[in-house]
Each structure stands twice: as structure tokens, then as C-alpha cells.
Amino acid sequence: MAGGEPLKNAPADNCANMGFSFLTGADDMGFYRNVLTSYTQAMFDSLQLAHPLSADKQPLFRHRINLVPGKQHHIDYRPTTPWLKQFSRNPYPKTVLWEDFDMDGRHRSGFYNLQVLARPSDNRTNYEMNINGNHVDLRISDVKYTTVQKDPQWGIEMKFYRDYSEATGGKVRLYLCEQLVDLSKPVEITINGKKVFSGKVKASLQSMVSSCAEYFDPCRVYPAYIDLAY
């Protein structure tokens, strides 16, 4: 990327489990791109401190965000590919962070091994999943944004405060595979601290067909799923 974006439009949480490169000209002042990039850098640094490692002991927020001295909107993109090529995709992270939000009237229907069957409200929803052994812990919250800084000329929303409250009334499908849990043993699932499932999860052809139709991803054809209401 070469220009900052208000974080309400691109929550940094959704960039966990990947390498993220973001270079912007230090003098790229159009639409406050340089300022917004500095806010993005601060957010990634904060998330890295709050979540240094995933449940499977992997760095969660690997990022390189810099303002390039003396540059405006035109920058040299050549350093990006050598930096990114050191990372490999992990389709089965044991920690997932996801802020589900409206994008021009549409929502994603799923993220990694989660599929939303019913949203808890019209608000944004934050999902945090951690898998330790055969215990899956889900934290699901409603997210409310409050704008704390606006540009005085165009009214661009620049900076935000996020308030979280426990979400209720939703339904989520949790897909599982051997890379995430031991399917030969019982699985325990908690949502917002409450046990919602305990027992063995049965593999089925239906799960494979359903996940294939949902994700269109050969790495995410899951043998089992559980539907969970909260």
C-alpha cells in the first residue's frame, strides 16, 4: 500500500497471521495519507504488544510500516516483494482475530475457519478465537466506534475509539480439522466464558461440501463443523 486509510475502513486486527508491508511517502499529504499511515503504524505496534504470539506460538502481527523520507505519492515499490517473500501462508492459525463490518452494504460470510450464520446485531462484530489443545475459546463482542478526530476541511474521520460489549443473539459455524484439534478426542468449546459444547465432533461429507462452497479454498475443505448459538 502507498497511502494511509482511516482504520475504520480497514481494521488492523484482520491482518493477524500474515506479513503486512505498508510504505508511504513522508511528504504524501494528500487526504492525510502520511498522517493516516502513522496512525496505522501505531495501531499495529499496539496490537503486536497486546498479542505478541498466537496460541500456537507464532508471531501474530508481523509488519513493516514506514514513512519514506523525501517522497510524496510516488514511491519505490521494489523493496516490498523481497520483504513479503519471507512469509508463508498459514491457513490453520490457532488464534484468529476478525472484525466483521459492513463494506458497501455487504459482509464477509466467513473468515479462516469461522462462518457467520446469524449476526448478533447490526453493529460491527469482533471475533477472537484461541485454540489450546482441544479447547476452543471464542470471544464475540459488539463493536461501537466513536470518532475522536476529524479533518476540519473535508470532515474525513481520522481517529477512533472502539468500545466493546459482549455480543448475544448470534450463531456461528466453527469448522475443525486435524491441524486445529485432535478429532479422535473430545472437544470443548466456550463462547464468552460459557461452555457451549463438549464432546466428540463427527466428520461428515456434508462438512466438506459446505466448507468447499463457503470458502472455495482447497486448504479449507474441513471434515467437521459445529453450529453454535450464543
Q: Model segments located where?
A:
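Alpha/beta-hydrolase-fold catalytic nucleophile elbow
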Residues: 1-2, 23, 69
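Acidic catalytic loop of the alpha/beta-hydrolase fold
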Residues: 6, 26-35
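Membrane-proximal bilayer-interacting regions
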Residues: 16, 34-38
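Short, well-ordered loop/turn elements at secondary-structure boundaries
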Residues: 16-17, 132
